[in-house]
A protein has these predicted regions:
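C-terminal helix/juxtamembrane-tail motif
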Residues: 9, 117, 188, 207-224
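Conserved cytochrome P450 K-helix/beta-meander segment immediately N-terminal to the heme-binding cysteine loop
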Residues: 74, 120-147
Length: 224
């Protein structure tokens, strides 16, 4: 609700409001890759500190409570935006999605007949070296405007593609940005040993989650 009011000029803050945000945060992270996976990615020190440096340029070292996130601030979080997109490429909320064919579809030598149900393996597409250079390397800069090409337009689908894509994708991106910006401004995330992307075993269920628990150390930043 705050986001909608802000967008229409009736509210300028996207505050850290427990009454509005907390239920949504838990729900969103269950769908957006799982909190453990997101925190693991945040433990990649070089990438995390790039995000933090960008946030320092916007807010300085004051606490999120003293300098709350405003809607217009989100437009300046360019690296964070790429960081989130790369996380969703490697760990899409929904690793698979079903579709009902309304017409025959030719795939190579085969024809999928109208009326059948198909499954689109989003995770496999996102990690396919045919479409992505070094697909198992976490590289937010692959989403720089000058690098975006056919892979982004045709093979990047964390919210799926076409007229039946996720209607809440813009809201989800805003919410994830606010949550991650708040977490990164407040805490430092570390792991004893850097985990490689291909070492994270995943459950291919309705939503993506890790098979094994992922331990992440959390330290509070010294802020004023």
């Amino acid at each position: 609700m705050k986001t909608l009011l802000c967008r229409h000029g009736r509210h300028t803050e996207i505050g850290y409001d427990p009454g509005i945000q907390n239920p949504s945060i838990g729900d969103e992270f269950r769908r957006a890759s799982g909190l453990a996976i997101v925190l693991t990615v945040l433990s990649f020190e070089d990438k995390r500190e790039k995000v933090y440096k960008e946030l320092l340029e916007i807010y300085g070292t004051v606490t999120p409570k003293s300098a709350r996130i405003k809607y217009e601030d989100l437009q300046h979080m360019n690296y964070l935006d790429r960081f989130i997109k790369e996380t969703m490429r490697l760990f899409p909320a929904a690793p698979l999605i079903g579709r009902h064919l309304t017409e025959d579809v030719k795939m190579g030598e085969f024809i999928l007949p109208k009326g059948v149900e198909i499954v689109v393996p989003i995770l496999s597409v996102h990690r396919n070296e045919k479409y992505w250079h070094n697909p198992l390397i976490f590289d937010p800069d692959r989403f720089l405007p000058e690098k975006i090409g056919t892979a982004y337009n045709n093979y990047y689908m964390p919210f799926f593609l076409g007229p039946r894509n996720c209607i809440g994708m813009k809201y989800a991106m805003i919410l994830i940005k606010v949550v991650l910006a708040t977490l990164i401004r407040t805490f430092i995330f570390k792991v004893d040993k850097r985990i490689q992307i291909d070492e994270i075993k995943l459950n291919m269920d309705v939503t993506l989650s890790s098979v094994e628990p992922i331990e992440v150390k959390i330290e509070k930043r010294e802020l004023r």
